[in-house]
Amino acid sequence: MLIYNDIISGDELISDSYDLVEVDGVAYEADCRKITIGGETFDTGANASAEGGDEEADDQKETKIDVVHAFQLQETNFDKKAYLGHLKSYMKKIKESMAASGASEDEVKEFEKGAQTFAKRVVGSFKDYEFLIGPSMDPDAMVVLLNYREDGVTPYVTLWKHGLKSTKV
């Protein structure tokens, strides 16, 4: 299995157990599922009816998105101006990382072009996105984008391809 870590924070953001689809050569999208957390009942073997009904667990059921839950992603908020400021800074760090890892100038330019196109698409539908960060809550790290498919039911996450480093486990 491959785990994908943020190149800035080192946070685990996703794994190849989710079907990653490359978009425009600069991003990955992965469909998610809504899961229910909590609400478990535990049978301790005691006769609860003999002692009253006070022994039930007070667990609340919560619906979460599997990727968000599995990788402990934290919701954060951005207005459009703040997100663009973060994105500009983050793209600069990705380009530096690409250059440091031996990427050619052509590869970096190709990334820049694709990233600009993709970023325009994100900004065009900015209000539809939710923003997530890794558990370290590093303000310089990748912001994972969460949106819903056209059916309005299927959530999916978007991650910057060049901002991830894969580790085999």
Swiss-Prot record:
<dbReference type="InterPro" id="IPR011057">
    <property type="entry name" value="Mss4-like_sf"/>
</dbReference>
<dbReference type="InterPro" id="IPR018105">
    <property type="entry name" value="Translational_control_tumour_p"/>
</dbReference>
<dbReference type="InterPro" id="IPR034737">
    <property type="entry name" value="TCTP"/>
</dbReference>
<keyword id="KW-0206">Cytoskeleton</keyword>
<feature type="domain" description="TCTP">
    <location>
        <begin position="1"/>
        <end position="169"/>
    </location>
</feature>
<dbReference type="GO" id="GO:0005874">
    <property type="term" value="C:microtubule"/>
</dbReference>
<dbReference type="GO" id="GO:0005829">
    <property type="term" value="C:cytosol"/>
</dbReference>
<comment type="function">
    <text>Involved in protein synthesis. Involved in microtubule stabilization.</text>
</comment>
<keyword id="KW-0648">Protein biosynthesis</keyword>
<keyword id="KW-0963">Cytoplasm</keyword>
<keyword id="KW-0493">Microtubule</keyword>
<keyword id="KW-0020">Allergen</keyword>
<comment type="similarity">
    <text>Belongs to the TCTP family.</text>
</comment>
<dbReference type="GO" id="GO:0005509">
    <property type="term" value="F:calcium ion binding"/>
</dbReference>
<protein>
    <recommendedName>
        <fullName>Translationally-controlled tumor protein homolog</fullName>
    </recommendedName>
</protein>
<dbReference type="GO" id="GO:0007026">
    <property type="term" value="P:negative regulation of microtubule depolymerization"/>
</dbReference>
<dbReference type="InterPro" id="IPR011323">
    <property type="entry name" value="Mss4/transl-control_tumour"/>
</dbReference>
<dbReference type="GO" id="GO:0002181">
    <property type="term" value="P:cytoplasmic translation"/>
</dbReference>
<dbReference type="Pfam" id="PF00838">
    <property type="entry name" value="TCTP"/>
</dbReference>
